[in-house]
Amino acid sequence: MHPDAQLKTALKNGFDPKLLYKEPLTTVKEPVCSILEKHSKVPVDKVVSHVNEVRDRAFAVFPYACIGQFSFVELSIADSPCYREMLERTKQGHKLLDLGCAFGQELRQLIYDGTPPTNLYGSDIQQDFLSLGYELFLDRAILPDSQLIAADVLDKQSALFQRLAGELNIVYISLFLHVFDFEKQITVAQNVLDLLKAEPGSMIVCRVTACRDQEVLAATQERMPYYYHDLASWNRLWEEVQKQTGVKLSVESWEQPDELVKKHPLPGIYILGSSIRRL
């Protein structure tokens, strides 16, 4: 479901978006603070107010949790054990897509750490999120808007596939797959494989919300219709993808420490990290 439709449904059912609104920040954590100072050239004494102002403007139009809770300044890509490899490969010319990139904040981390912007792409179903990324990072002259593509990953006719099918070396997916049920996740995974070069070493890196207690999760499905994996279901997903596509993959997974899970209302939630490599 498109995020606009999800929001409208929630509001219709009586959801109060103020519940998603966190009090203004008094500090901005690293690495975003340094990125805004050195990459975006925001004066040191203006960083906090700049972030708060962008959040408030965005939330007035798009009252989503990722905006209200300042998730866009909580970067995670560098926490992945695959980050060093992703960084070195993109420095050498390999092409990376951040799928479901929101404000494109993880792309700015890669640029700040030395990746040429021309080797990076971002895609989100919400064009306004891509535009808000420019309001936050003030870097349209550094990261051309041609590198950011508004598209639905389920639409094989979209600009994303017209431009990048078979062209990418790495696709990064963070906290995105859970909005789809299991069957649609299979389709998403197959579509992502179509974006990658059909050669050994092409890689998907994932950061996935997972749940140890699937019975607790099942009880919440009506009011929170997300599909949170456990390790068994995650492995089953990629086994099914290999079966349906005939593509051989190597899947490695791990539990990844993450501040996000401390805020989650359900017990047993954790972050599952994974790399999926084409053999």
Swiss-Prot record:
Known function: Methyltransferase; part of the gene cluster that mediates the biosynthesis of paraherquonin, a meroterpenoid with a unique, highly congested hexacyclic molecular architecture. The first step of the pathway is the synthesis of 3,5-dimethylorsellinic acid (DMOA) by the polyketide synthase prhL.
Protein keywords: Methyltransferase, S-adenosyl-L-methionine, Transferase
Pathway as given in its UniProt record: Secondary metabolite biosynthesis; terpenoid biosynthesis
InterPro entries per UniProt: Meroterpenoid_MTases (IPR051654), SAM-dependent_MTases_sf (IPR029063)
Name under which the protein is recorded: Methyltransferase prhM
This protein's record includes keyword S-adenosyl-L-methionine: yes
Positions with a binding annotation for S-adenosyl-L-methionine: 124-125, 152-153
EC number: 2.1.3.-
Gene assigned in the entry: prhM
GO molecular function annotations of the record: methyltransferase activity
Keyword Ribosomal protein: no
One of the GO BP terms on file: terpenoid biosynthetic process
UniProt record similarity statement: Belongs to the class I-like SAM-binding methyltransferase superfamily.
